A protein has these predicted regions:
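Short beta-strand segments of immunoglobulin-like
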Residues: 50-58, 350-355
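Terminal connector regions
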Residues: 112-141
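Acidic, S/T/G-rich, low-cysteine, solvent-exposed domains in lumenal/extracellular/periplasmic regions
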Residues: 17-35, 155-349, 381, 394, ...
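Membrane-embedded catalytic interface detector for glycan/lipid assembly enzymes
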Residues: 270, 308-314, 319-326, 331-493, ...
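DG-centered beta-turn motif at the end of beta-strands
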Residues: 1-20, 214
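Proline/serine/threonine-rich low-complexity linkers at boundaries of modular beta-sandwich domains
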Residues: 34-48
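Short beta-strand elements
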Residues: 132-151, 158, 417-431
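Beta-strand-rich binding/interaction modules
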Residues: 61-98, 105-110, 118-124, 161, ...
Length: 504
């Protein structure tokens, strides 16, 4: 609309709070903005915001624990909201929840009976009348076997071979340090270095990339370690590195039972446990990494076996070589369960879900493609071709605005399924709270007007905003009323005079 040359812009909305930015709206010079706020009903709404699986590695037939984050976006308590978990179309859990107004509640759901392969999972709520956010999708892979890469100087370590041969779930592959396929490193959740006298610059750089992307690296120094090369590997990863070799009998003085590695290992820990005996060891440097945790320590709480968070991954460093000349650790009863726990904590699968519109980069294991073999996201007849970028150790997918519908998609290369990926809506839409008139006024420039809808029609509101309050109809009505009164008065007084003037 135009009013004396000025442009008028009308924005009609209920103005949910999630639409508001942190900065005020700027209007063009000569443009008048009118915000017409529709009156919205207050509706109850509960949604699943996110989920997380407690196990990093998923094994066939084993129990899984899923942490669910439930959010009540309404201003009143939600009573007994039914929730159902489906995995590959089969119901795995059922429950109901009462959540206080505007509250967040966490719950852990236990389920089992999974077969090897990709799992397509859905959480469903019954929460009427707002239903657009009643489904939450996620996916994960149950491995038939877990690959482990053992890198050494050319001679396999018998203790490591014995550990991973004890459980057929682990598929350990031995490779000498001069024959490593760097492109495949990202396919191994766990890489173990042992008996390497020196670590090459190229290997150190590749392992740094591997850890930053979420891999787990376990380092056992050799009998005669080149300490400079070990420092070049570990220092950039914010992990301790071996500094010097000390010879002398000592013993591990304690273990950190609070460390995740020892979770569920002991039913009842003895007061005087049998701990590894040490004949010689490397002193480990102090690390500035505040996310480090001792697994075992020597007298004076000197680190013996320690873990560090680095990038998206983990680094574990031992102060001894896997050799009985150093300690009896390789034959100790603690060695196998600790190694298993490190392996099972090492999973770095893809995220359980992605969010539509978040412009996230989707990272999958390396997939070789050519113009005739394109990667496609497929769901119930829909086929979307993402932009693909190859990086060392991974394939990156960029969706931009190609994807518009939530659900679970198969990432396919021709007829083979490379991965299964879940997408959900941004849960900011679930918050059905609205801006007040004062909050709207603070967001718009001085040249703007906030119009709150009421019983009046939108047409009358716009007319009043443009031309002011129109009184001409009222004036005409009042004029007619006054005219009628005047006519009545004239007739009354005229009749009265005639009656008075008549002779007696």
């Amino acid at each position: 609309m135009h009013k004396e040359g000025a442009r008028s812009l009308y924005v009609i909305s209920d103005f949910q709070k999630n639409m508001a930015g942190s900065q005020s709206v700027k209007a063009d010079t000569g443009q008048h903005i009118s915000l017409v706020q529709l009156k919205a009903s207050t509706l109850p709404n509960v949604a699943v915001d996110s989920v997380a699986l407690l196990s990093a590695i998923h094994r066939p037939g084993e129990s899984e624990k899923l942490v669910v984050r439930l959010h009540n976006y309404a201003g009143e308590t939600a009573e007994k909201i039914p929730l159902k978990l489906l995995v590959n179309g089969a119901q795995k859990a059922l429950g109901s929840y009462t959540i206080k107004a505007r509250a967040v509640q966490y719950d852990t759901i236990t389920f089992s009976g999974l077969q090897a392969g990709w799992q397509r999972a859905e959480i469903s709520l019954q929460d009427n009348p707002v239903t657009f956010d009643n489904q939450f999708y996620f996916s994960f892979n149950v491995r038939q076997q877990m690959p482990v890469l053992l890198i050494d100087g050319g001679t396999p370590n018998p203790y490591l071979n014995a550990v991973f041969a004890a459980d057929p779930f682990f598929n350990a592959r031995h490779v000498p340090d001069g024959n490593i396929d760097y492109a495949s490193l990202n396919t191994y959740p766990l890489i173990v270095l042992s008996d390497l006298n020196a670590i090459s610059t190229g290997l150190a750089q590749q392992l740094k990339t591997y850890v930053n992307k979420g891999g787990t690296l376990l380092v056992f120094p050799s009998n005669d370690a080149d300490l400079t090369s070990y420092r070049a590997l570990l220092e950039p990863l914010n992990a301790a590195y071996p500094e010097k070799l000390l010879i002398g009998d000592t013993k591990v003085s304690g273990i950190n039972l609070q460390n995740q590695v020892f979770k569920n290992i002991f039913e009842d820990f003895p007061q005087n446990p049998d701990l590894p005996v040490v004949k010689k060891y490397y002193t480990l440097s102090s690390s500035s990494n505040n996310r480090s945790e001792n697994i075992m320590f020597l007298p004076g709480r000197l680190p013996f076996w320690t873990g560090y968070s680095s990038g998206r991954g983990k680094v574990y460093v031992s102060a001894v070589a896997l050799d009985e000349d150093f300690s009896n650790l390789p034959r100790h009863a603690l060695f196998l369960p600790v190694m298993f726990r490190i392996a099972l904590l090492s999973g770095h699968d893809q995220p359980l879900f992605y969010t539509l519109g978040a412009d996230e980069t989707i990272e999958v294991p390396p997939v070789q493609t050519n113009p005739k073999q394109l990667l496609k996201l497929v769901k119930q007849g829909q086929s979307i071709i993402p932009e693909v970028k190859q990086e060392e150790g991974s394939t990156l997918l960029y969706m931009a605005d190609r994807l518009q519908e939530t659900g679970i998609y198969d990432l396919k290369k021709q007829d083979s399924t490379v991965a299964v990926i879940a997408f959900n809506d941004n849960r900011s839409e679930s918050d059905l709270s609205y801006l007040s008139g004062s909050e709207l006024s603070a967001l718009v420039p001085r040249a703007a007007t906030v119009l709150a809808s009421g019983k009046a029609s939108l047409k009358s509101m716009v007319t009043e905003s443009n031309f002011g309050l129109q009184l001409w109809k009222l004036c005409i009505i009042l004029a007619l009323i006054f005219l009628g009164v005047e006519i009545a008065l004239i007739r009354f007084f005229k009749t009265d005079r005639q009656q008075v003037s008549q002779p007696v």
